[in-house]
């Protein structure tokens, strides 16, 4: 007969603990008789008093009440709303400490999920200046005391924190959004009210080309009509000559989804342009484009290095998106085939290939695990396979396709170390050997870490 385990802690109890680790979302982990307790802002090695605030069968949540000892990596957060906004999770940890924590996270999942304890995991490639790196701001608009507020949602809520600036956001976007808020307020624009499904302006988005200096402004509205549109556009265009595109997206639905189906250019071009390395990209309101282009170049350079191309290879890029990695590879490969399930992304990929006069990149729409075997039957034999899947990792059918096709080399670009480790294990069981894993810090002060790994057929 089984006995029901009783958690060793109770709600509202005060206890002393030592934090052993960080979770994937940046909380400190302490254990009482092997029972884990998750505490926001706790750092490994610290001794602290905590208050138990929620007890579950297999874990509990606590609140940090008092530190008895401090980690040498602890620091005061630089953002004044750090503890309210959910955008960053690690500002209380020095940047050196963040990079070490991310490296440990990658090593741990390689061993625990992938069974790959012997695979070299290199130190994380970080930024010289880990601030003001984001080129896209997507800001909800609300009303308070008769005026407009623009900022970010309080962690775990839809309560908008009004922010004048964000320390990880390009200053150009911050400045523009604050002025747009003022101009809209002056012209009587009302904010969307989610509960009542009333009001006009839902979100404002700004996209900034870090190399070109061009900016796109997007109004996301509940109604097709934007009152005083002409005056608003004229004022913005006069004040910000770097704004090359103003776009309106209409979302009439009662939903948390930001974008609606209809997008209209109000001023200037449908696109702004930017460069990653020598490759030029056209960016529309809905385009996927990496938000940290400086570190994207680091990631893509490492991908190119791991692909070891000499100009004679055929490369397949699965989950190719707007063709950003494909075009990087096409600089060195004989031929690159990219596949992506989103038709609009492939339109962007073809546009970007033409923009760069690249004739050796070809793109197809569809599921990678369907399109790639079709190409194989048509005689497309990949020497190198590159995959850059979403957070859920590669589809099992695609991994089986790679194993069946037997390209000599596989380069795996990942935004989730856990699914990377899982998929590397499958590829190893199918005849590949993982050579090395390079983590890259694309999002300083958050818990996210990107990786690029390469495998060879053995």
Curated annotation (Swiss-Prot):
Enzyme Commission numbers on file: 2.1.1.-
GO BP term (any one): rRNA base methylation
Active site (catalytic residues): 415 (nucleophile)
InterPro entries in the cross-refs: MeTrfase_TrmA_AS (IPR030390), MeTrfase_TrmA_CS (IPR030391), NA-bd_OB-fold (IPR012340), SAM-dependent_MTases_sf (IPR029063), TRAM_dom (IPR002792), TRM5-TYW2-like_MTfase (IPR056743), U5_MeTrfase_fam (IPR010280)
Keywords: 4Fe-4S, Iron, Iron-sulfur, Metal-binding, Methyltransferase, S-adenosyl-L-methionine, Transferase
Binding-site residues for [4Fe-4S] cluster, renumbered to this chain: 79, 85, 88, 166
Name of the top EC class for this enzyme: transferase
UniProt entry tagged with the keyword Signal: no
PROSITE patterns, sorted: SAM_MT_RNA_M5U, TRAM, TRMA_1, TRMA_2
Taxonomy, superkingdom: Bacteria
Gene Ontology MF terms: 4 iron, 4 sulfur cluster binding; metal ion binding; rRNA (uridine-C5-)-methyltransferase activity
Domain TRAM: 8-66
UniProt-listed PANTHER family: RNA M5U METHYLTRANSFERASE, TRNA (URACIL(54)-C(5))-METHYLTRANSFERASE
Family to which the UniProt record says this protein belongs: Belongs to the class I-like SAM-binding methyltransferase superfamily. RNA M5U methyltransferase family.
Name this polypeptide is given: Uncharacterized RNA methyltransferase BC_0364
């Amino acid at each position: 007969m089984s006995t029901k385990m009783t958690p060793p802690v109770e709600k509202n109890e005060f206890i002393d603990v030592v934090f052993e680790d960080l979770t994937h979302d940046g909380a400190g982990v302490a254990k009482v008789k092997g029972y884990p307790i998750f505490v926001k802002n706790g750092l490994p090695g610290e001794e602290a008093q905590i208050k138990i605030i929620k007890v579950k069968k297999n874990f509990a949540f606590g609140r940090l009440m008092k530190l008895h000892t401090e980690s040498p990596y602890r620091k005061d957060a630089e953002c004044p709303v750090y503890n309210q906004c959910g955008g960053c999770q690690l500002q209380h940890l020095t940047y050196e400490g963040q990079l070490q924590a991310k490296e440990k996270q990658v090593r741990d999942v390689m061993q625990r999920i992938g069974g790959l304890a012997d695979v070299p995991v290199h130190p994380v490639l970080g930024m010289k200046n880990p601030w003001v790196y984001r080129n896209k701001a997507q800001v909800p608009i609300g009303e308070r005391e008769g005026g407009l507020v623009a900022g970010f949602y309080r962690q775990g809520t839809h309560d908008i924190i009004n922010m004048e600036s964000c320390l990880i956001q390009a200053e150009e976007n911050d400045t523009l959004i604050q002025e747009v808020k003022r101009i809209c307020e002056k012209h009587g624009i009302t904010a969307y009210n989610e509960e009542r499904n009333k009001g006009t302006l839902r979100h404002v988005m700004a996209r900034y080309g870090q190399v070109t200096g061009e900016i796109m402004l997007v109004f996301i509205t509940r109604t097709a009509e934007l009152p005083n549109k002409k005056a608003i556009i004229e004022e913005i265009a006069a004040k910000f000559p770097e704004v090359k595109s103003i776009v309106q997206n209409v979302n009439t639905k009662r939903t948390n989804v930001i974008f609606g189906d209809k997008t209209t250019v109000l001023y200037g071009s449908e696109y702004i342009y930017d460069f990653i390395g020598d490759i030029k990209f056209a960016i529309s309101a809905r385009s996927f484009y990496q938000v940290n282009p400086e570190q994207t170049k680091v990631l893509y350079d490492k991908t190119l290095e791991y692909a070891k191309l000499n100009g004679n290879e055929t490369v397949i890029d699965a989950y190719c998106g707007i063709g950003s990695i494909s075009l990087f590879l096409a600089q060195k490969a004989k031929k690159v085939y990219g596949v992506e399930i989103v038709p609009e992304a492939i339109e962007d990929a073809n546009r970007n290939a033409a923009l760069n006069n690249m004739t050796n990149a070809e793109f197809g729409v569809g599921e990678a695990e369907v399109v790639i075997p079709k190409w194989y039957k048509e005689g497309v034999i990949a020497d190198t396979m590159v995959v850059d899947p979403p957070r859920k990792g590669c589809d099992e059918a695609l991994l089986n396709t790679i194993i069946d096709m037997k390209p000599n080399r596989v380069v795996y670009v990942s935004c989730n170390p856990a699914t990377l480790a899982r998929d590397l294990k499958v590829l190893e069981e199918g005849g590949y050997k993982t050579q090395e894993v390079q983590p890259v810090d694309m999002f300083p002060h958050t818990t996210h870490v990107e990786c690029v790994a390469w495998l060879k057929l053995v």
